[in-house]
Swiss-Prot record:
GO terms for cellular component: cytoplasm. The lineage of its organism: Bacteria, Bacillati, Bacillota, Bacilli, Bacillales. Its EC number is 2.1.1.-. GO terms for molecular function: protein-lysine N-methyltransferase activity. It catalyses: L-lysyl-[protein] + 3 S-adenosyl-L-methionine = N(6),N(6),N(6)-trimethyl-L-lysyl-[protein] + 3 S-adenosyl-L-homocysteine + 3 H(+). This is Ribosomal protein L11 methyltransferase.
Amino acid sequence: MKWSEISIHTTHEAVEAISNILHEAGAGGVVIEDPYDLVKERDDWYGEIVELNPDDYPEEGVIIKAYLPVNSFLGETVEQIKQAINNLWLYDIDLGKNKITLSEVNEEEWATAWKKHYHPVKVSEKFTIVPTWETYEPASRDELIIEMDPGMAFGTGTHPTTVMCLQALEKYVRPGDHVIDVGTGSGILSIAAAMLGAQSVRALDLDPVAVDSARLNVKLNKVQHIVTVSQNNLLDHIEEPADVIVANILAEIILRFTGDAYRLLKPGGRFITSGIIQAKKQDVKDGLLAAGFAIEEINVMEDWVAVVALKP
């Protein structure tokens, strides 16, 4: 089978939004080539060692590659992708160069591209993320393994916003907690909360592609008895109180439901947020304070920010 590789040269800020557009267009996988992966300290990744080829990475910005089946609808699909990406300007998302190119690859090249960019990554004291085809032996009995299907948007490691959310969940989720994951995407944060002992996790996403992917990954990690995945717009119509709410989405979207998050959290509960670029940090902080939260932590990794807010 022939595949067409669509390559988009963009910014860190636009990665998650463009990845979502590509999945909705039916991409058979997304690869993220981020030059930060070449220069970041290995200590940040708990000793993970991966051989990376500098020739695969841009000097600046990020390259997102996706694979589309070559068929009679390819031209129309590519035009729809371009239009959807251009529309991101309406949300004040910086697209950078926004250079889009196409090339053809065969089935074997497509499979090789995946394996080149997808490796086990230890992202916190407890969590290691492992692609489904790799055999990985835990270093200790306390290490928690999250298996992920390669159909998700993954780069050579894990996106900094996901890493910071995982680290915050590890710190704040307690056995018996009730957790809500807003904009669950692949479901990775919901899976982590379940593995940390949460009694129940509600994984919410408006995108039906994300809902299907999250359900597959939840089942793959055998936590479907704890995690319920459903299609939902943010926290609309959600009434069950929570001990922890986590949201790894754009700052503008976080600000739309800070009031709902405050309403649903129990006293002493925490709202863990990321997907925030440095330029939007103060906006998110101000919005959380206005909703009644106290700011407990602000963490930074590369150009990204995570905020942990406490409901007094």
